[in-house]
């Protein structure tokens, strides 16, 4: 399995590309470099918001190019951010945090199948950019 980022513009790029353009660039790059024998690609979110990462994954899985690999997610921040925001370290918030985590897992499961249509709401925690300048792993 490979664990790359999607092909997205840099954080300071002024151009906003559509999910379909990101999908086409990502799948094209994979087709040029990844042998079909590789069983799957598990994408990192790369600082995208939770919703943006889900929408882009969905677009990748509906891209009209041949995709011989399973294309799914291996998100950290883009799977956990809403849950952590809801939890805030308080035991009383555990149920709300669990609900947020399950919701994001379900959304990303649908996106991995190319069946996610988007929430249409980028105003909540899921719509917040998760970009961290000079992030070190």
From Swiss-Prot:
Q: Which reaction does it catalyse?
A: beta-D-fructose 1,6-bisphosphate = D-glyceraldehyde 3-phosphate + dihydroxyacetone phosphate
EC class, as a word, reads lyase
Q: A Gene Ontology biological process annotation?
A: glycolytic process
Question: What EC number(s) does the entry state?
Answer: 4.1.2.13
Where are the active-site residues found? 3 (schiff-base intermediate with dihydroxyacetone-p)
UniProt KW rRNA-binding keyword:
no
| Protein family membership | Belongs to the class I fructose-bisphosphate aldolase family.
The record's note on quaternary structure and interaction partners says: Homotetramer.
Protein name per its UniProtKB record: Fructose-bisphosphate aldolase C
